[in-house]
Design a protein with these regions (language model features):
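Conserved class I S-adenosyl-L-methionine
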Residues: 1-34, 42-46, 65-68, 72, ...
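C-terminal helical/coil "lid" or tail adjacent to the Rossmann-like core of SAM-dependent
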Residues: 2-3, 186-246
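Class I SAM-dependent methyltransferase SAM/SAH-binding core
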Residues: 32-36, 40-90, 114
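A short acidic, Gly/Pro-enriched loop at the edge of an enzyme's catalytic core
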Residues: 90-100
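A short SAM/SAH-binding and catalytic strip from SAM-dependent methyltransferases
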Residues: 98-112, 135
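Helix-to-beta-strand junctions that scaffold the AdoMet/dcAdoMet cofactor pocket
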Residues: 109-110, 123-125
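Core SAM-dependent methyltransferase catalytic element
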Residues: 256-268
Length: 268
């Protein structure tokens, strides 16, 4: 279950990729903007401030996240939709879409390469599609998670839940996919050298980060509190060795993959 408060503990670090992604979207005055995987709505509300005249739609599968989003949206600036992006129908909006944003979602959606062409088709000519996904599934934060899961008595249940890295392609794959369906494409990758917990307030800052994302599938399987505590303790200990605290905080490198595409005029 998604926990908005846990996820937002590192809001500044999580916001930066969104800002880098959307800075490359050149839409001037879009009429319809969709945020796929809007989460707690923090970034979606930024879109409403950037394009105040647009109809903004935030789509997410987590009722908990959408509840938080609605509470934050005191001005009713956004239409919040509870839906799975795999079954979400762009035609339900009744008009072509000008901008589709997907920030840090598609790693959870293994089928996204076959969904992207449909989203591009739903764009108005000249419309924009922008996506960002983590590319750090071979980093210690993830390899150690799989190692601890493999040693668990419930490895058979845990390991199948930890295959998100297989859903994420290398940057060139997204370039060829989007260029092949009639888009002008900008694809890049960045490794952020993140400094977590500079004030040394957390026992394990990388563990706190993963509790908001990567660790969630494990916690979904391990319902027993003792099982959870044992797993988290073993994983946390391994993380402290892989990411030792420095005098200025804990360095947590994080690779991310970006793709921004503009649908060429004259294509529908």
């Amino acid at each position: 279950m998604w926990n908005p408060e846990q996820y937002e503990k590192f809001s500044d670090h999580r916001r930066r990729p969104f800002a880098d992604l959307t800075s490359r979207v050149g839409a001037g005055s879009p009429e319809i903007v969709v945020d796929l995987g809007c989460g707690s709505g923090t970034h979606t509300l930024e879109l409403s401030r950037r394009w105040p005249r647009a109809r903004i739609i935030g789509v997410d599968l987590s009722a908990e996240m959408l509840d938080q989003a609605r509470r934050s949206d005191s001005g009713d600036l956004v239409e919040w939709v509870l839906a799975d992006v795999e079954s979400w129908d762009p035609a339900s909006l009744g008009a072509p879409i000008d901008v589709i944003i997907s920030n840090s979602l598609l790693q959870w959606v293994p089928s996204h390469p076959r969904l992207i062409p449909g989203w591009i088709a739903a764009l108005a000519p000249g419309g924009w599609f922008a996506m960002q996904v983590p590319g750090n599934f071979n980093a210690p934060s993830h390899t150690l998670l799989r190692d601890v899961a493999a040693k668990s008595p419930r490895a058979g249940e845990l390991l199948p839940c930890l295959g998100r890295g297989e859903a994420v392609s290398e940057p060139a794959v997204y370039l060829f996919l989007l260029a092949g369906i009639g888009c002008d494409v900008d694809v890049w990758e960045t490794t952020y050298q993140q400094i977590l917990d500079p004030d040394a307030l957390q026992d394990g800052p990388v563990l706190e980060w993963t509790k908001g994302t990567a660790l969630l599938p494990v916690l979904g399987v391990l319902k027993d509190e003792c099982e959870r505590a044992d797993f988290v303790a073993a994983y946390g200990k391994a993380l402290l060795q892989a990411y030792p605290r420095q005098p200025f905080g804990t360095v947590f490198p994080f690779r991310r993959i970006f793709a921004v595409a503009q649908k060429k005029e004259g294509r529908d």
